[in-house]
C-alpha cells in the first residue's frame, strides 16, 4: 500500500512537470489562521507560508478561526456568510482552482464545512480536506440524520482526505476508499527548530515537568494537578510548569486552575501565559520531562516540539499519538484520568542518565519525520494531483 501511494504521488509530480503550466497553481485555503494560537492554526500558518514561498503556487486565504471563548451566534453567522461569499466569488472567477479545507471537529463546525464544500463543488473545483484532530467521526455520528447524510455525500466528493496518522484513517472508513485517504505527519515551524540544540540539561536537585497546551479539562490539566498534589504529599522534588491560555480566554470557569490549586493546597505548580518564539523555547529547554495527559488528540504539535528539544514524553494512548512513537522508548503512556500513573511515569524518568539517553531517541524521531519540508512537500504533491485531476 505504501509503495502504491508513493508511486501515485510520483506520477502526479511527473504530470506536473510535463504540462509545464505558465501560471501558478491556485489554492483557496480555507482554514483557521492565528490568532488564536492552536495546533490547527499553527499548522495552517506553516502550510500557507510553505506554499507562498513556492513560485508554483498562489494562495487565497479564507480564515475560519474562532476565538477560544466563542462569540455570539449572530457574529459567528456573519463571519461564516462573509467567508462563504468570498470563497464563492473566488471559485466563480477561477477556472482552475483547488480548494483546501481544514475540516472542523464538532457538529457545528461540520455544518459550516458542509456549506463550504458545497460552494467548492458547484463549479466542480477539486477539494482536499485536512483533519487536524481525531474527533471528526464522533461529531459526524452525533449530527441529526438528515444533516449526517448530506455531510457524508459532500465528504464522498473529496479528491483526498488528509489525516495525521494511520490510526486516524478510520474517521473516513465507509466514506472514502483507502487510496483517497492520505496520512501526512505534522511539521514544526522552522523558526522553532532553529532554536533547538543538542545541549544536555543542567544537573539540579529537582525535576521540572512541562505542560504546554490550553488549560482545559480535555487536555488532562486537572488530572495533572491531582498528580502534582500526590507528588507534593509524597515529598517528591517535582516541579510542574503549566504554559498556556489563561482561564479568562477559554470556555471554562474563570481562574479554574488557580482556584483548584488553592482549594487543594497545591504549591508545586508554576503557571505562565501562552509563549511563542524564544520564550516558548526557553520553557522547553528548562524542562526535564514533557507531559500531555489528554482525553483525545490528533497529532499534538507540542509533543513533536518536545521531541525536537530532546524531552521524554508522558502522554495517553489517544488519537494519533501512538503513531508518533511506534515502539520508541522515549514515551511513557498513562491511562486517561490516572494521576497515580502520572506520578509513576515521572518516577521512571527520575534518573538524569536515562533522560539524557532518551534525548537522542526523541530527536531522531523528530528529525526523521516532522520537519516542515517533509510536511509541506507531501501536501504540495496532493494539491498538484488535485489541480491536474
Q: What is each of the regions a protein language model found here?
A:
Residues 150-195, 204:
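Donor nucleotide-sugar binding/catalytic pocket of nucleotide-sugar-dependent glycosyltransferases
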Residues 354-369:
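A short, well-ordered alpha-helix in the C-terminal region of glycosyltransferases
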Residues 327, 331-339, 348-353:
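Conserved acidic donor-binding segment of nucleotide-sugar-dependent glycosyltransferases
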Residues 28, 200-229, 240-243:
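Conserved donor-binding/catalytic core segment of Leloir-type glycosyltransferases
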Residues 295:
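Aromatic "clamp/platform" in nucleotide-sugar-dependent glycosyltransferases that forms part
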Residues 239-267, 278-279:
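Short, structured helix-loop element that forms part of the nucleotide-activated donor/catalytic region
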Residues 274, 282-287:
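Short alpha-helical donor nucleotide-sugar binding micro-motif in glycosyltransferases
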Residues 312-315:
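Short hydrophobic beta-strand element within catalytic cores of glycosyltransferases
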